[in-house]
Amino acid sequence: IINEIVRLKPDFVTFSEVRNYNKTNFTARVCASLQEKGLKYYSFYTYDTGLLSKHPITDSLTVFPEKNDHGSIYRLTSSVNGKKVAVYTAHLDYLDCAYYNARGYDGSTWKEIPLPASVDEIMKVNVASQRDDAIRMFIAQAEKDLANGYRVIVGGDFNEPSHRDWIEKNKNLYDHNGFVVPWTVTTLLEEAGFIDSYRKIYPNPLTHPGFTYPSDNLAKTPEKITWAPKADERDRIDFIDRKSVV
């Protein structure tokens, strides 16, 4: 992680699945390690997700607090070249993970199950999670930031695909099993005017699926690094979205 930040020198970093084991502070440790390499970054205490800024932080906020491992969202504000920026990190609920149901696995237990009978059945599972609750809270806060002249960026692990990626043209690829699914979180973001940065640059999910999960590890068998070893579970569930009124 440190080497990648040193290599890229990003203005902001969003972390997902942060764990402050043994009463430690993960982002403070990262900042200290970067300081040893001559880079100054700022942060604040978080749990489950985390944020770093190369620019002084003017405010921080817990938008969706972590409770019982259902994810979290935090926000910082800063400025870059005189432009006000609000950056959010999001790790959304991993349970009721309905894109597994669409592939014949239960999205909470990851045991094999019969395929759903309909898209409605998939969506019923999907909205049982807290992902949509969290993203609605994000949108509400982001609208306040936008009204105050901030550019808004959200990055993180949504644990849910994009409705732009489960379409008619690829419904028989990647074990979509014929389903065209209007996934909730990305639909809500798009309706609120947010731009999916990757899909903006690469609008065709057939030529650029943009898979972010699972990652490959030649040292491990598929059963050790996947939740659904008998299915093609490749998907894009990690995103950077943005919105500006300027």
Description of each model-found segment:
Residues I1-K37, D235:
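N-terminal, active-site-proximal structural segment of metallo-dependent hydrolase catalytic domains
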Residues I1-N3, S53-V246:
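Active-site regions of metal-assisted phosphoester/phosphodiester hydrolases
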Residues P10, Y47, G71-I73:
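Extracytoplasmic
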Residues D11, K40, I195:
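Short acidic/polar active-site loop segments enriched in Thr and Asp
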Residues S16-R19, Y45-T46, I201-P203:
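Short, solvent-exposed turn/loop segments enriched in Gly/Ser/Thr/Pro and often Arg
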Residues V18-T24, Y47-L51, D157-P161:
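Acidic helix-start/capping segments at beta-turn-to-alpha-helix junctions
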Residues E36-Y41, P56-D59:
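Short small/polar-residue motifs
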Residues G38-G50:
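A short, structured active-site edge motif that brings together acidic residues
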